[in-house]
A protein has these predicted regions:
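Short catalytic/ligand-binding loop motif for oxyanion handling, primarily in non-cytosolic enzymes
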Residues: 13-15, 42-46
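Histidine-anchored nucleotide/phosphate-binding helix
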Residues: 15-27
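Secretory-pathway luminal glycosyltransferase catalytic domains
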Residues: 46-155
Length: 155
């Protein structure tokens, strides 16, 4: 498998942690990492990471199926899982699992990865990515208020 896939889901905060994990995975494994954004297809939530200059590509349906071994019959997937050859990570929420950033047969990662140790090595890059540009200054026009802007309440 020449790539890894990280599921992006939840609100903006969760998406930011998942993206930071994906970037860290890319750096640690020197492997292409794709983002699975299919969660948003049937959700009221929106993919909000696009507010930032993210640079990881989105995974196609075929790439997701390959990463999750969905191209194999369910019986074969279940047998491989029982033998320890599962390629989908367990859901990770708050705990830190350093083995996830090491080479393994895992190809699909889902969870929230809400521990900064996942991206300590690339912290400056993550901070730069998620720093919003300064707001544009609003230039106030000085001058006379046009007569049509007044309303006479005395009538």
């Amino acid at each position: 498998m020449a790539f890894k896939v990280v599921q992006i889901c939840g609100g903006l905060g969760n998406q930011m942690f998942q993206y930071a994990f994906a970037k860290s995975l890319q750096k640690h494994l020197n492997t292409p990492v794709l983002l699975d954004i299919t969660f948003f297809d049937g959700s009221n939530r929106k993919m909000q990471l696009e507010l930032f200059p993210i640079d990881l590509p989105y995974a196609s349906a075929k790439e997701i199926a390959i990463a999750k071994m969905q191209h194999l019959p369910k019986l074969v997937r279940d047998a491989l899982k029982c033998m320890g050859f599962d390629r989908v990570s367990q859901e990770i929420v708050f705990e830190y699992e350093p083995k996830l950033l090491k080479p393994s047969r895992l190809t699909y990662f889902f969870g929230y990865f809400q521990d900064p140790r996942y991206f300590d090595a690339i912290s400056p890059l993550i901070k730069q990515t998620f720093t919003l540009p300064p707001p544009k200054k609003i230039v106030k026009k000085r001058g006379r208020i046009p007569p049509q802007a007044f309303f006479d309440f005395s009538r």
